[in-house]
């Protein structure tokens, strides 16, 4: 019995030691959202390798398939699209040189529901809609896979008006890749 008590005491001391050495809080201004305000946190490295060139045009199709465990939180794939915009603009690439299309399907499908239908399904307002609106203002096309809408038994008119209803993610991704877009799975 004493061995068990000694082991448990040692384990508790070790756990306390680990939690005492937890990472410090980030200082103010450590993370920024220079273009898509409030979304897609970045910590810019001005001398980082593989920095985008301001004069180039960047064409990316984001394949958003991940869902979210918390329906009241922004979909992490959509937040990564915002992060990508923020990184390119922070590197000096003008928004007009970014040709970004983000297509949602699979577990990401619900992110494009209008607020009424998202509330009906999840009991909370759709937290993705403000970000979708900001991305659209920045020139990003948010698309929804029509086949995924059908698979989820959603109606097509339940999709938010800021979202483009695509025939499918399969055809969207391959069509855009044929047009020179780089695929970024999220």
Predicted regions and their residues:
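Bacterial N-terminal signal peptides that target proteins for export
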Residues: 1-8
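Acidic helix-start/capping segments at beta-turn-to-alpha-helix junctions
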Residues: 95-112
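Structural recognition of the beta-strand scaffold that forms the well-ordered cores
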Residues: 59-63, 100-104, 141-144
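A cross-taxonomic marker for long C-terminal extensions/tails that follow the last structured domain
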Residues: 9, 13, 23-28, 32-37, ...
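Histidine-anchored nucleotide/phosphate-binding helix
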Residues: 74-93
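Solvent-exposed, acidic/flexible segments
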Residues: 67-77, 125, 166
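N-terminal signal peptide c-region/cleavage motif recognized by signal peptidases
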Residues: 17-20
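Acidic/histidine-rich, surface-exposed loop or edge segments in extracytoplasmic proteins
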Residues: 53-71, 112-116
């Amino acid at each position: 019995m004493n061995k068990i008590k000694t082991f448990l005491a040692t384990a508790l001391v070790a756990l306390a030691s680990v939690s005492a050495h937890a990472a410090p809080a980030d200082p103010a201004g450590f993370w920024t959202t220079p273009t898509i305000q409030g979304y897609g946190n970045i910590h810019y490295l001005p001398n980082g390798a593989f920095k985008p060139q301001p004069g180039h045009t960047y064409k990316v199709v984001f394949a958003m398939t991940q869902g979210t465990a918390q329906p009241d939180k922004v979909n992490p794939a959509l937040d990564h699209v915002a992060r990508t915009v923020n990184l390119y603009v922070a590197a000096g690439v003008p928004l007009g040189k970014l040709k970004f299309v983000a297509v949602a399907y699979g577990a990401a499908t619900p992110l494009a529901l209008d607020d009424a239908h998202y509330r009906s399904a999840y009991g909370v307002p759709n937290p993705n809609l403000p970000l979708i609106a900001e991305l659209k203002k920045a020139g990003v096309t948010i698309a929804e896979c029509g086949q995924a809408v059908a698979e989820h038994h959603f109606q097509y008119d339940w999709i938010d008006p800021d979202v483009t209803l695509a025939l499918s993610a399969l055809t969207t991704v391959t069509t855009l890749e044929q047009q020179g877009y780089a695929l970024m799975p999220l």
